[in-house]
């Protein structure tokens, strides 16, 4: 939507500029093209400036106690533009399975830094807040956007600190602030396989009695490689299914994690399975 609007505006401005100018013959074509490129780059710079200014006042050292409607609208506008620039052809299946009312825990396999962008873009009304590694808070603009979306940083090397993050996520769901999204492998898969899940994050669902939405994604690890070669990347995103809270009683988080793992692996296919030595 954003890129489309920018392109239309740039084209209109370019045509008007040339129509009001003194161009003739081939000069009309080259003049219009040059004006179009100039206006498009100008509009792109304005769009980036709006994002930068919006983030400039965000202080990530202060606790974020409320989800930002402004930043939700902002990412809803900008993410389709990012997907277009990166030539992502997102093929979403099973979205009708998402709970229509109430909060939930969303889990997905993790292949690329672009996975959260993909999920936010496909499910904008879900108000997803991600559990993320601490290093992501230091990324340019990204850390501030995450903060305003109530994303929670987790210390993967300290169990006590990690528990605090889990408890905060439980609190946010109980207070009906956001739904929580997490990559239960705990890290980006470097070999493309679906690695074993960390069962602790499933306690977010069992303690709050919310559904677990299982998603799988493919090919996001190839996006940057392909875009440098001007190639499109087909990105399948599947909502595999939903584990309902009625099935939780009498089961441990480990049991539920294993059920989710098995269903997601079945959807991804045998090429995502770990070697036997794992």
Regions from the language model: what does each represent?
Residues 1-103:
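Membrane-anchoring hydrophobic helices of lipid-metabolizing enzymes
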Residues 77-78, 90-94, 116-117, 166-169, ...:
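A generic local structural motif
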Residues 53-77, 84-85, 100-159:
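Catalytic core of membrane glycerolipid acyltransferases/transacylases, capturing the structured
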Residues 92, 106, 130, 237-239:
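Generic preference for hydrophobic
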Residues 85-87, 125, 146-148, 175, ...:
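Short, well-ordered coil/turn elements that cap or connect secondary structure elements
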Residues 163-278:
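Non-catalytic C-terminal accessory region of glycerolipid acyltransferases
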